[in-house]
Amino acid sequence: MQPCLVKIRRIRSGSDLPLPRYMTPHAAGMDLCADVDADLVLEPGERALVPTGIAIALPDGFEAQIRPRSGLALKHGIALVNSPGTIDPDYRGEIGVIIVNHGADAFVVRRGERIAQMVFAPFVRAELLDVDELDETARGDGGFGHTGR
């Protein structure tokens, strides 16, 4: 498989944070670190936009998906509000991660903490065709649990 070449820029020069990286040889996502100057305390139910200190330039036809880290979700109830978040190939601003604390205790985001993961994926752009009717299928309009719980 041909790698997707992504240009990356540190927002603040001289940053001590590592660039996003794969943590295992077969990982699908690169971990993103929190670029906060001071500890950020999230009380239960609170959400915050956490900066990552990086901006990227994706090749046309690719997106970056920002996804939660399962360990933070399981151990602390930390999730992403818009999961997955999408970074479009024409966006050049800093990547921010909107996290929410669904846990019972306060959660502290510290500088350099791995808060999310970034997965690169190709996408297609659809053309919409306005029609009066759609073709029939066996499923029809069944949804929202129609096959069971």
Swiss-Prot record:
Catalytic activity: dUTP + H2O = dUMP + diphosphate + H(+)
GO terms for biological process, alphabetical: dUMP biosynthetic process; dUTP catabolic process
Keywords carried by this UniProt record: Hydrolase, Magnesium, Metal-binding, Nucleotide metabolism
Its EC number(s): 3.6.1.23
Pathway annotation from the record: Pyrimidine metabolism; dUMP biosynthesis; dUMP from dCTP (dUTP route): step 2/2
MF terms (GO), sorted A to Z: dUTP diphosphatase activity; magnesium ion binding
Cofactor(s) this protein requires: Mg(2+)
InterPro entries named in the record: dUTPase, dUTPase-like, dUTPase-like_sf, dUTPase_trimeric
One Pfam family of this chain: dUTPase
Highest taxon of source: Bacteria
Enzyme class: hydrolase
Binding annotation for substrate: R69, S70, G71, N82, T86, I87, D88
Signal peptide: none
Keyword Magnesium: yes
Keyword Hydrolase: yes
Family: Belongs to the dUTPase family.
NCBIfam families per UniProt: dut, PRK00601.1
Function: This enzyme is involved in nucleotide metabolism: it produces dUMP, the immediate precursor of thymidine nucleotides and it decreases the intracellular concentration of dUTP so that uracil cannot be incorporated into DNA.
Protein name: Deoxyuridine 5'-triphosphate nucleotidohydrolase
Species the sequence originates in: Geobacter sulfurreducens (strain ATCC 51573 / DSM 12127 / PCA)
